[in-house]
Amino acid sequence: MFGLWGLLLFGSPAVLSGTVAADAGIEYDSNPARVPSDGSLGVLPQGSPLVRGLWSGSLAYAGPKQRLRLSATTTGKVFLTSEQQQQNVLVAQLGYEHGAKIGRSLIVGTIDYYDAFQADAPQYLERDFRSLAAGGRFQSVRPLEGGHRIDGVLHLTGQLFHYKPDPLQSFVGPSLFAKLGGRVHAGDPELGHDFDLSVHGRGDYRIYGPVRRDVFVSVGGSIQWQGPLLIQVGYSAQVNLSSTELESYQRHLPMLKLAFHLPGELFVTMKGQLNLQKSALGLTVPIQSIDEDNRSLVLLDLERPLPKGFAISARYCGYFSLPADGTSPYQRHTALLNFSYRFAR
């Protein structure tokens, strides 16, 4: 792969392309251990500053028919207080895609690997996990007159999720994802407005072991308008049906996103999402869960591009549980100042 990167940097065929990205930032996290706010796990949230970094790269080959893409990402967090050193984490991700173009369609085989390595911590505060997914994806785009477009994706994978602290939370099984979208262009061909519509669905069958089986179903849609600013409204409904008592639930996820450009090359993104969950009393949200997927969310992001691919950004995220969730009260706030670099060829 390093040889291919050399070709890319110092003179390569037009069919080769690649990207490099690097981030470094300082952040404050009010709840690094992601524990309930009421101390029900025997520990209360304790904030800490941290430094974080990310490196990622991708290399793609596009021939007359063949398509190939390799990607790698590594990221990590190091907390600056001794009490939160056990939340230090290093993450590695690898991706591989190989497929063929048939007309306006693409058929691709995919492999995705994710592994997190957390510092030693009590088992109830560990959240590192490993996942592997392999399968195939079909996608197609049909351009229409006037700048309109229809596109679709169908992705079937087999997935393995290994929760390292507790094998009973690990599962294996198939997953099917489908998405249908379209773009409607209005006004001037170059300066007009775009309306993007999409609907999506996902179904998983998860085998947790000899006694537990879950069926997870998610459906939703979004509409986005992009002109002088971007406005997106979305909604998802999720149902988890489990053979284990207390693990079934349903939730509704309305979302609103707003992005715009201020004078001085300042890009602003705001997002809010509610997690309206209904379940039997006693449902727990494992701390290894991703907050963006399992909590109500408020986000504010400011980014200022700099010359030669650099940028500086600031981001606030707040994660909350709602009283109607039927789960332990939860709050987490993060504030990040980040420097980034992007290169593409």
Predicted segments — roles?
Residues 1-11:
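Bacterial N-terminal signal peptides
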Residues 13-345:
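Gram-negative and organellar
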